[in-house]
């Protein structure tokens, strides 16, 4: 299985990346306020690491320069040609209370491969230049968006990306580590370091919450892998290790579907993305490596060590799961071309391992069966089950005796009739004297009848039959 990789120096520290389509990548970053010649930019590139030259591997389609005196972009997302960028204006303007249009909207024209600025807005009205837009996300269909501030506790806003109007404001319980939309955009989930909260984007109300995570986990990233299932990545507070956990939020209840420590090589992760099918996750580690995880069994499938020379700020997967892109504060873009249908691919090593595992299980089962037959264990087991389970089952008391009724036969002359008596512990009849005639036979009923139905025994005493002359 072959991976093709390529790297490119974009010329500025990159803090955000997002695929606009299967091979078109948007990158944002810059030197920030007082950038010393390092621009603040948005760059659109067509990527293909299989090409021969760097220019073909990373073909710049469009660039948009931001104000030199403004801060560098801190967060971006895009959907259906709409791009939202979190980027503060210059600090002097902010501290003077002149506003800070920290959320900016762009449009990408895929026909002309051009970026166009549309509008910007100030939601926070902050005079603290250290406050910035930490997270920006748009739903897959582009119908709803969410932003979160760097404040603690953070303010999260659900907005309409079409006109940048606010729908809801959510006061969180602490620092928002990450957030993400369900595939249909009806639900947004966010995490703090120790909790998960799920919010309806229709009503703004909380529909699910989980706070009982492992105390040794520090939650860091979240992504929906289905409309009712989220994937959360956490680092271990004590020692190295990354844990992935799948959590169902169906019907407003949270339940852990599976958790697994996928590696003990990393101390933390800086970014995570999941493909559109919910089959593959890509993680960026604190040691500047890229890791691929197959979500069907939460197995670590590939690690690209030291993909960048400095901190990885974001990873993203193309819509068709062909490319994985990562960007870094080291001014670099790194592209990995994945093998076809990689998430479901089984390597030769895995096939051999599975074969030998199955072979050993078959041999072991055959040995057990042979041993059982040789020592007649199957008959012993059957007899044991018969004596201890089947017999007991047949004698379990019920409203009626076996065959549902206890049958008593009473003879009248040469004929017989059968009557049914419900089962009780005992039926006792005393002093009954009744004479009746049946076909010329007089019957005197018993002086004392005792029917012990517990043991299905009958005692009939003093039964007298007298012949009656036909007159």
UniProtKB/Swiss-Prot annotation:
Start-end of each WD repeat: 259-300, 302-341
InterPro entries: Sec12-like, WD40/YVTN_repeat-like_dom_sf, WD40_rpt
Regions that span the bilayer: 355-373
Keywords recorded for this protein, A-Z: Endoplasmic reticulum, ER-Golgi transport, Glycoprotein, Golgi apparatus, GTPase activation, Membrane, Protein transport, Repeat, Signal-anchor, Transmembrane, Transmembrane helix, Transport, WD repeat
Record keyword Protein transport present: yes
Positions in the Lumenal compartment: 374-471
Highest rank taxon of the organism: Eukaryota
Ranges facing Cytoplasmic side: 1-354
Glycosylation-annotated residues: 439, 462
One GO term of the biological process aspect: endoplasmic reticulum to Golgi vesicle-mediated transport
Presence of keyword Ligase: no
Main localisation: endoplasmic reticulum
Entry's Gene Ontology cellular component terms: endoplasmic reticulum; endoplasmic reticulum membrane; Golgi apparatus
Molecular function in Gene Ontology: GTPase activator activity; guanyl-nucleotide exchange factor activity
Subcellular location: Endoplasmic reticulum membrane; Golgi apparatus, cis-Golgi network membrane
Function, in words: Guanine nucleotide-exchange factor (GEF) required for the formation or budding of transport vesicles from the ER. This function involves the cytoplasmic domain of the protein, which is thought to interact with the small GTP-binding protein SAR1. Required for autophagy.
Family: Belongs to the WD repeat SEC12 family.
Other comment: In the process of transport, SEC12 itself may migrate to the Golgi apparatus and function in subsequent transport events.
Protein's name in the database: Guanine nucleotide-exchange factor SEC12
């Amino acid at each position: 299985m072959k991976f093709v990789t390529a790297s490119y120096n974009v010329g500025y520290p990159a803090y955000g990346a997002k695929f606009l389509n299967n091979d078109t990548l948007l990158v944002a970053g810059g030197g920030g306020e007082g950038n010393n010649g390092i621009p603040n930019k948005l760059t659109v590139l067509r990527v293909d690491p299989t090409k021969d030259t760097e220019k073909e591997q990373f073909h710049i389609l469009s660039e948009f320069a931001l104000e030199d005196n403004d801060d560098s972009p801190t967060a971006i997302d895009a959907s259906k040609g709409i791009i939202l960028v979190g980027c503060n204006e210059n600090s002097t303007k902010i501290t003077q209370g002149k506003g800070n249009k920290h959320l900016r909207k762009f449009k990408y024209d895929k026909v002309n491969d051009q970026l166009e600025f549309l509008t910007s807005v100030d939601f926070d009205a902050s005079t603290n230049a250290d406050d910035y837009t930490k997270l920006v996300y748009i739903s897959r269909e582009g119908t709803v968006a969410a932003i979160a501030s760097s404040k603690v506790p953070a303010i999260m806003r659900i907005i309409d990306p079409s006109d940048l109007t606010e729908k809801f404001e959510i006061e969180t319980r602490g620092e928002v580590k990450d957030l993400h939309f369900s595939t249909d955009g009806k639900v947004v989930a966010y995490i703090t370091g120790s909790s998960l909260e799920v919010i309806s984007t229709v009503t703004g109300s909380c529909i699910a919450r989980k706070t009982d995570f492992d105390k040794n986990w520090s939650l860091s990233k979240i992504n929906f892998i289905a409309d009712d299932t989220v994937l959360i990545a956490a680092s271990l507070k004590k020692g190295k290790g990354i844990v992935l956990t799948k959590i169902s939020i169906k019907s407003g209840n949270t339940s852990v579907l599976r958790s697994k420590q996928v590696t003990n090589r990393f101390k933390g992760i800086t970014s995570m993305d999941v493909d559109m099918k919910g089959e593959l996750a890509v993680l960026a580690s604190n040691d500047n490596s890229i890791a691929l995880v197959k979500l069907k069994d939460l197995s670590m499938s590939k690690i690209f060590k030291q993909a960048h020379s400095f901190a990885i700020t974001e990873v993203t997967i193309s819509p068709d799961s062909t490319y994985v892109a990562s960007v870094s504060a080291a001014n670099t873009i790194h592209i990995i071309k994945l093998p076809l249908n990689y998430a479901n691919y089984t390597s030769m090593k895995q096939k051999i391992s599975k074969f030998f595992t199955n072979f050993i299980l078959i041999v072991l089962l055959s040995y057990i069966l042979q041993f059982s037959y040789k020592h007649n264990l199957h008959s012993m087991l059957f007899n044991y089950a018969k004596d201890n389970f089947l017999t007991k089952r047949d004698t379990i008391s019920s409203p009626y005796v076996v065959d549902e009724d206890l049958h008593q036969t009473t003879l009248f002359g040469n004929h017989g009739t059968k009557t049914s008596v419900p089962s009780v512990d005992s039926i006792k009849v005393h002093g009954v004297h009744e004479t009746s005639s049946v076909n010329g036979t007089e019957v005197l009923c018993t002086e004392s009848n005792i029917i012990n139905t517990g043991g299905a025994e009958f005692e009939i005493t003093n039964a007298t039959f007298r012949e009656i002359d036909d007159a």
